[in-house]
């Protein structure tokens, strides 16, 4: 995971699916009972189990990418002992609240996700009080009285904890990303068996765009030929994507297609022209994250006209 630019996770969105004879919404949990949740077995159950964790990280990541040009300099200044009159810190408290709620309401069947969540929360318990003190120090402009002595003392506590947080957070992000991709693959296998070719194409598009953003390295080690080959395949697939069976899904697909095309153009410009421009990598991630947001609105269940719908 590239430090400072943690991509949003393309969540598996079901919209409303028919499960076991009943209507089951994407945010609905089978049960709050831990034993029941841990022994879920269907793809839908597992999707709903990890969904709150993905939502928690999506929110944190969106802020982190949007304010990377302030968050990264703040950390570097605190690490190096250089001083500024303002600081920008990540939204640690919001992440902690969201992860605690996810852990309470939706235990997952994945030990790596559960353990990584516990690790992140353990670090946040130590990090948040120091971050609060640091924020208050700068808001109250105490540096005007002590010539940044208090800042240096708090930074000595904050920086090691922040580094520890990034390590544990990246582990959780990676675990969720891997599990999410597994669920995409499981869902795709089901759809292949049901001859849902449009939904399969949609899933493969999301997997390919995720692979592409991971291939692009801001340090100059990008395999540009591989990226370009992916972009060409993405373009072919997005042009083949059909609009779906309902007006709502058709609108969502059109917006998704437009967003994918924007991402392809941005990625191509980056590897050809803009890779030496520092802000270009952030802008590429913003385009990617926008595309993920559009993908999450598409109801895969309504992408193909099934035999049941045709009757």
Can you annotate each of these PLM segments?
Residues 44-150:
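N-terminal Sec/ER secretory leader and immediately downstream segment
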Residues 229-311:
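A cross-kingdom marker for long, charged
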Residues 29-84, 152-159, 174, 186-207, ...:
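Immediate post-signal-peptide N-terminus of mature secreted/exported proteins
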Residues 2-15:
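N-terminal Sec-pathway targeting helices
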Residues 12, 16-27:
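Hydrophobic alpha-helical membrane-insertion segments, chiefly the h-region
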Residues 64-78, 102-109, 131-145, 179, ...:
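Secondary-structure edge/capping motif, primarily at the C-terminal ends of alpha-helices
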Residues 151-257:
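Extended amphipathic alpha-helical interaction segments
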Residues 132-163, 271-285, 289:
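Polar/charged, Q/E/K-enriched amphipathic alpha-helical segments with strong coiled-coil propensity
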């Amino acid at each position: 995971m590239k430090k400072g630019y943690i991509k949003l996770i393309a969540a598996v969105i079901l919209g409303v699916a028919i499960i076991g004879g009943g209507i089951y919404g994407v945010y609905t949990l089978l049960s709050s009972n831990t034993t029941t949740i841990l022994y879920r077995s269907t793809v839908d159950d597992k999707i709903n189990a990890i969904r709150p964790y993905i939502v928690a990280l999506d929110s944190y990541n969106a802020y982190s990418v949007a304010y990377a040009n302030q968050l990264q300099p703040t950390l570097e200044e605190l690490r190096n002992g250089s001083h500024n009159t303002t600081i920008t810190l990540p939204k640690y408290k919001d992440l902690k609240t969201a992860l605690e709620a996810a852990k309470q309401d939706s235990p997952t069947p994945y030990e790596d996700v559960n353990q990584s969540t516990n690790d992140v929360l353990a670090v946040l318990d130590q990090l948040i009080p120091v971050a609060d003190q640091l924020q208050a120090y700068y808001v109250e402009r105490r540096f005007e009285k002590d010539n940044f002595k208090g800042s240096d003392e708090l930074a000595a506590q904050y920086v090691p904890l922040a580094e520890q947080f990034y390590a544990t957070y990246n582990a959780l992000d990676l675990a969720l990303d891997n599990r999410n991709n597994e669920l995409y693959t499981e869902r795709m296998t089901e759809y292949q068996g049901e001859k849902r070719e449009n939904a399969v194409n949609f899933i493969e598009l999301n997997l390919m765009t995720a692979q592409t953003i991971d291939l692009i390295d801001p340090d100059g080690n990008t395999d540009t030929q591989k990226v370009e080959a992916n972009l060409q395949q993405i373009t072919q697939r997005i042009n083949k994507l059909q609009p779906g069976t309902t007006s709502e899904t058709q609108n969502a697909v059109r917006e998704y297609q437009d967003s994918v095309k924007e991402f392809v153009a941005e990625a191509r410009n980056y590897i050809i022209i803009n890779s030496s421009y520092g802000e270009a990598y952030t802008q590429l991630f913003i385009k990617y994250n926008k595309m993920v947001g559009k993908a999450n609105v598409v109801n895969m269940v309504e992408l193909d006209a099934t035999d049941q719908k045709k009757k």
